[in-house]
Amino acid sequence: MAYSGFQFGAFNPQMGDGRAMLLGEVEKDGRLWDLHAKGTGLTPFSRLGSDGRGTLSSMLREYLISEAMHALGVPTTRALAVISTGRPIQRGHVQPAGIVVRVAASHIRVGTFHLAAQTDYTRQLADYAIARHYPGADYQEFFTQVMDAQIRTVSHWMRLGFIHGVMNTDNTTISGETIDY
């Protein structure tokens, strides 16, 4: 899912998702879950000069930290698999490329709304997000519930002494799940 937003104090209209794709939704026990692959290669949202891939080590880090956070009771995306692509990737030095497949209640980020605002799709996105995550809420209640979910998540981080290294609008989900390690 594409998104834009504020990063390092400035607005960036094209932040991502230039290396990931939403594979679809699955239902389990009456809930929808997003299946998402990261490090898949170029997408229509890739930035100029990007190859859309990720290192195997960064995908393994995402897997390990997300599973540790889950075990510690922190709302988070979950990693289903890490796949070595068998291809080399240049990131400082040549190393193996990888893909992480993850699952979450949502991959809709605050930055997804920043992008929607540029294209007049904010109401459609909000209506979808409310129906999916906060049924029956009006827009004000939706905003309040998203804030509450994010506050609960950050309080879990504080309890553990965890600091998200790049905490901005692209790494903040409306479901309150920790994303992108």
Question: Can you describe what each PLM-predicted range is?
Answer:
Residues K28, Q145-V146:
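Acidic/polar, glycine-anchored loop/turn motif associated with catalytic or activation segments
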Residues V146-L160:
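Phosphate/ATP-binding catalytic cores across multiple sugar-kinase/actin-like superfamilies
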Residues V94-A97, R159-H164, N168-Y181:
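Catalytic activation segment of kinase domains across protein kinase-like and atypical kinase folds
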Residues M1-A137, R152-T153, I174-E177:
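Conserved ATP-binding subdomain of kinase catalytic cores across diverse folds
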Residues A137-T144:
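Membrane-interfacial amphipathic/re-entrant helices at transmembrane-helix boundaries
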